[in-house]
Amino acid sequence: MANDITAHWKDLLRKRLASLKPDGRTEEEKKAEESELFSKYYTEWKGGEKGEDDSFKHIPRFYYRLPAEDEVLMQKLREESRAVFLQRKSRELLDNEELQNLWFLLDKHQVPPTTGDEAMISYESFLKVGEKAGTKCKLFFTARVYAKLLHNDPYGRISIMQFFNYVMRKVWLHQTRIGLSLYDVAGQGYLRESDLENYILELIPTLPQLDGLEKSFYSFYVCTAVRKFFFFLDPLHTGKIKIQDILACSFLDDLLELRDEELSKESQESNWFSAPSALRVYGQYLNLDKDHNGMLSKEELSRYGTGTLTSVFLDRVYQACLTYDGEMDYKTYLDFVLALENRKEPAALQYIFKLLDMENKGYLNVFALNYFFRAIQEQMKIHGQEPVSFQDVKDEIFDMVKPKDPYKITLQDLVNSGQGDTVSSILIDLNGFWTYENREVLVANDTDSNAADLDDT
């Protein structure tokens, strides 16, 4: 009996000593085992993978389900892993010191002669700089990048300034993508309206041109800014925009232009995101809201702009757009303004076309054109003008658009023709129709005034 107990203890001691021997595995192997064990125990805790097919072991996984609300552990794991990933990507970017060092190296390796005031660099020197600049710069020093920037230099060189601006632009794009991705709660590569609102709200203090805005106006400013992104980048009203689309359009450039403390007055007035522009749009809304209930009735909206939008068109606005007890809120008003102020843009034409296409047929026929133009004729009578024949106007519209089907005008026809803004103005706005009808007189007046200015000089 005693011998059995002694043998048992000897066996336990041998096992203990064996476990104390140094582990010969690498850190990567240990982490791999840790990850494997975590997956195994987590799967067991969730109830296991019942009825899993053998093919799952051979087919790569291509769909990753988002964790449900009750899967707190998976949500936390996903958030942490995304944060670590974005931090790593951020560290891979060139910082200011590294960019300055790159500029110094490029300047040191410039190859004469200069072209005008621009310093140039040859491909051989370009590769030398790439070797000295460090690993972070490797992706910029490729034959493809050099060929992109190669123009008509007789010595086969590229401009140092153009190359450096290319690097700066790439770094900025990656920084901005990482910054936007931090607000991508779902981690799917797109931003919802609330995500973009948070991004712009936190961006406001970094934009000197917005220093004069009262904090009480921030919510209206954010709404004004966000609506432009969603009006043009989310035409199907999915409620989300791809981060790639945000980076590809010029809106973010316009927004970040407000970092310039010396931005000209003209630039501010033409920039939708500037303080003067946002205050102008909001001020117009308040001026239209005569009963001060925070909403616009059809009668109040009829005074928009020059007050010459037809009642038939306004009826369609209130039928087709989201309203509350027959009145329009600020967000819906912003869509209306963006459509009318950007009538050349496809998204704006889509908005107006939807209102003109009363029967949702996907095209405008002679009946639809006549329905809207009759309101223009009625307004002309009210103002003591001789009504223009619809047949003449109809023929002019079809001549301008040149639709594929000679009896139907589709949205694509309007976009392709480049005359969508003119056609929509003729049908919905008396002032727009008058401008079109008297275009030759207006051009002649402009020519005369320009000639007079030249004579004065």
From Swiss-Prot:
Keywords: Calcium, Cytoplasm, Metal-binding, Nucleus, Repeat
Main location class: nucleus
GO molecular function: metal ion binding
Record flagged with keyword Zinc: no
GO CC, one annotated term: cytoplasm
Amino acids binding Ca(2+): D289, D291, N293, M295, E300
Stretches assigned to the EF-hand domain: 276-311, 344-379
Lineage: superkingdom: Eukaryota
Annotated compartments: Nucleus; Cytoplasm
Function field: Possible role in the regulation of cell death.
Entry-linked PANTHER family: SERINE/THREONINE-PROTEIN PHOSPHATASE 2A REGULATORY SUBUNIT B'' SUBUNIT GAMMA, SERINE_THREONINE-PROTEIN PHOSPHATASE 2A REGULATORY SUBUNIT B'' SUBUNIT GAMMA
Identification of the protein by name: Serine/threonine-protein phosphatase 2A regulatory subunit B'' subunit gamma
Organism of origin: Danio rerio
Taxonomy of the source species: Eukaryota, Metazoa, Chordata, Craniata, Vertebrata
Gene designation: ppp2r3c
